[in-house]
Amino acid sequence: VKKRLAFVVTLSLVVMLLAGQALAQGNFPNKQINLIIQASPGGLSDLTARTVGSVAAEILGVPVVFTNRPGAAGAVAMSYVKESRADGYTIGYVPVELAMVEALGYAQDLNPSSFDLICASNIAAATITVRADSGWETLEDLVEWCKANPGKLRVGNSGTGSVWYVAGASWAQAAGVEVNHVPFDGAAPAVAAILGKHIDMVPVSEMEVRSGVESGELRILAVLSDERSQYNPDVPTLKELGYDITVAAWGGFAAPKGLPEEVLAVLVDAFGQGVQS
């Protein structure tokens, strides 16, 4: 009798637990969602995540709280998301570096298959950007200076191994010049550094240098895309200048692996609308 009673009690608890989980999933979301961003505030990833996340919050009817966890080309933030509960209340902005961090040695078992992908959000080409008062009017001017001053050009990036590091290194190799790579925890600190004259060039996206270009403090010498930008149509592509290089960042949103299908569907809808808005 005691064994039968224990079995009945255990079975009842299991049923209640499963029912509670089903009810919670059916009411998803009913509390704030934490969105982890792999870069410092102010850069492309941060701006994209906050813009899309804010729209998604309105659609979902719950707050979306943003937390920046920069470091190790995004591995710090992405590892945190991967190890979080797969309940939909912790998600992350994942950048192109997600496909690179294992090869770079920043993390193990961290790649696109580690997550349930919610949606893609953006693609942004790199640029070759310098200060407007640098004296470099064209990319040819910059290359000539670099060849006359090997190793002296300070090129800021969003972290060693990041997509903007790859952009700067690819251009330098193709141009046959030696530069000094200076890593930062995101593109925003790198842009702040070039504005403060602590570095000389940044190979980041147009969005990240737009305010500096519009204020007349920065100048874009080239874009690393197949076609010229609609925002700066007078700026040539690297291909036009003889360099067969295109580098672009992409990003999106992801959740820990194993998210319930109905929860994932809610997030896909809300964040998909956020991207389209």
Functional labels for PLM-detected ranges:
Residues 1-9:
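Bacterial N-terminal signal peptides that target proteins for export
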Residues 4-5, 21-24:
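Intrinsically disordered, low-complexity Ser/Thr/Pro-rich tracts
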Residues 9-19:
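Bacterial N-terminal signal peptides
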Residues 24-114, 152, 176-203, 212:
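N-terminal (or domain-start) structured segment
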Residues 56, 80-89, 102-189, 238, ...:
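Hinge/capping helix and adjacent helix->loop/strand transition within the periplasmic-binding protein
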Residues 95-97, 134, 159-161, 224-227:
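Short, flexible active-site-adjacent loop segments at beta-strand->alpha-helix junctions, enriched
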Residues 97-106, 169-174, 201-233:
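A ligand-binding cleft/hinge motif common to bilobed small-molecule-binding domains
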